[in-house]
Amino acid sequence: MDRIDRIDKTTKKNRRLSLVVILSVLFILSFGLVFADEWKQALPGYEFSFARDHASHPDYKIEWWYYTGNVVTPDDHRFGYQLTFFRVGVDREPVNPSRWAVRDLFMAHLAVTDISGQKFRFTEKINRAGIGWAGAATDSYRVWNEDWEARQNQQGQMTLRAMQDGIGLELTLDQGKPPVIHGARGISQKGAQAGNASHYYSLTRMPTRGAIVIDGQRYEVTGLSWMDHEFGTSFLEKEQQGWNWLSLQLDDQTELMLYEFRRADGQRDLHTSGTFVDSSGQAATIAASEFTLTPEAQWLSPKTGASYPVIWKVSVPSRRIELTVRAAVNDQELDTRESTRVNYWEGAVEVTGTKDGRPVQGRGYLEMTGYAGAAMSAILK
């Protein structure tokens, strides 16, 4: 047993060292010299095509595939989950043809929230693509990081698989509603400068079944998931500190996505936006002037000292929507110093309120960045 423990500690130490090396490459190369290689910018006029656009877009510097969901066991034990795969371009056309050349780095985050048990668990991975440890296909949808994987099967379903440190998931997701493209003319504008944008779409209501694992215990579950896929090259501007982002699935079969950029001076950024999806899948953009997000209660992180709003009032008068959004568990902060080096809060939320004057309930996910540490504009510049 002592020998196994020593091997395990050595493996973890070596892994930490390899992460330091990879992160050094990421922050020296990825955010310094890469623009000389002319990564493609997210510009108006992009035409989405599915299922092609589920796959990777290696001409762009930054890309992520993001899944969240709220699921439940037959005996009403509730869970939330997040599985995200990130690709960051380092060298668009490496001079060195070696398989060890670093063209892209791949990070991945896995989190499971035991809502009924009031527990939150998180783990992460980071690898380079060149030697097959991680990657993303361009001819079909498959993205992976070691044994974590998201892919589309022959029936058009998404399958997710990830397991590490006593938490994991094995889920099958049906598409549900058609893809929702955010923004206008094929782009979601994030800043004033041309190219400070992304190509961004979502699958907003995906029937889900499979299994969740937490603390080594497996639970069979069903529920709903949400997928985001976003790609671009330069996203934010230096005045932008972070964002508050909500994806809400309401019990009247509608969905609401809102994001609010916060500036370093505390003011709301003009490039705040959102999307409303009706019960038939038709989507409409919500302008910044059409909604407000008001924090009602805070949670102080004992790990980072950051104060995160965990109750929000959401008002969209143009849609006659008035909601209260509450964190299902207050502590859903992700400490990602071994991968993206960004501490952020991302977790399951519960929704109550009114829509069109009638009571409505729902569930969803809330993401809050820029509350702990560096501004997000230093990362996604």
Q: What is each stretch, according to the model?
A:
Residues L17, F31-A36:
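Intrinsically disordered, low-complexity Ser/Thr/Pro-rich tracts
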Residues V20-S30:
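Bacterial N-terminal signal peptides
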Residues F35-K381:
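Structured soluble/peripheral alpha/beta segments that form catalytic or ligand/cofactor-binding pockets
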Residues T10-V21:
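Bacterial N-terminal signal peptides that target proteins for export
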Residues D2-T11:
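Asp/Glu-rich intrinsically disordered low-complexity tracts
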